[in-house]
């Protein structure tokens, strides 16, 4: 989400409403970051995720509300919902963003979905020729079931060998 040191920047000016400006200033102060940094983070969130996810009609809800839905459903119903919905939206977003399905574009989707979707924290470590991706979340065991099954359906779209494991608060992918 942050601007890399190597990325070229441009200077532009925009007209925005005074109320939007004041809200942005207040948010930047509360996060202890500059207004410029906040604006860049918001623009990156939109360009890397928002403009694609908005095309498929997202429903914004709190984690606690989503968790209540998960807990009201059986594990098998969660698996089926994840497997059914898993490949459709990611495939649409990956193709809209990259134009091709590949291991790299699938991994970019997972990074973006966690970074901007807010359902998990993403960690990636490369060691001894393997990549280990850990998605940490607070959705409980059924959340891990949902995430794991979505990931399995996404990985099914490309030729990728992976191992997947999960616990109550994490899903681990080894590639």
What name fits each language-model region?
Residues 33-57:
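Short, basic amphipathic alpha-helical segments that act as recognition/interaction helices
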Residues 63-132:
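An N-terminal amphipathic alpha-helical segment
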Residues 1-18, 28:
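Short Lys/Arg-rich basic patches
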Residues 59-63, 147:
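Intrinsically disordered, low-complexity segments
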Residues 112-167:
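Short, hydrophobic/π-rich interface segment
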Residues 166-175:
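Beta-rich nucleic-acid/ligand-interaction surfaces
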């Amino acid at each position: 989400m942050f601007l890399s040191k190597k990325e070229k920047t441009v200077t532009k000016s925009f007209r925005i409403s005074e109320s939007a400006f004041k809200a942005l200033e207040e948010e930047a102060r509360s996060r202890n970051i500059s207004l410029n940094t906040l604006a860049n983070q918001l623009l990156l969130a939109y360009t890397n995720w928002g403009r694609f996810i908005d095309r498929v009609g997202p429903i914004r809800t709190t984690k606690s509300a989503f968790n209540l839905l998960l807990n009201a459903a059986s594990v098998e119903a969660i698996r089926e919902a994840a497997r059914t919905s898993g490949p459709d939206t990611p495939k649409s977003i990956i193709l809209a963003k990259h134009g091709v399905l590949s291991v790299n574009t699938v991994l970019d989707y997972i990074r973006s979905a966690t970074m901007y979707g807010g359902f998990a924290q993403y960690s990636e470590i490369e060691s001894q020729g393997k990549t280990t991706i850990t998605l940490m979340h607070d959705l409980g065991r059924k959340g891990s079931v949902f995430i794991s099954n979505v990931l399995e359906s996404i990985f099914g779209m490309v030729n990728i060998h992976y191992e997947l494991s999960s616990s109550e608060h994490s899903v681990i992918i080894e590639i």
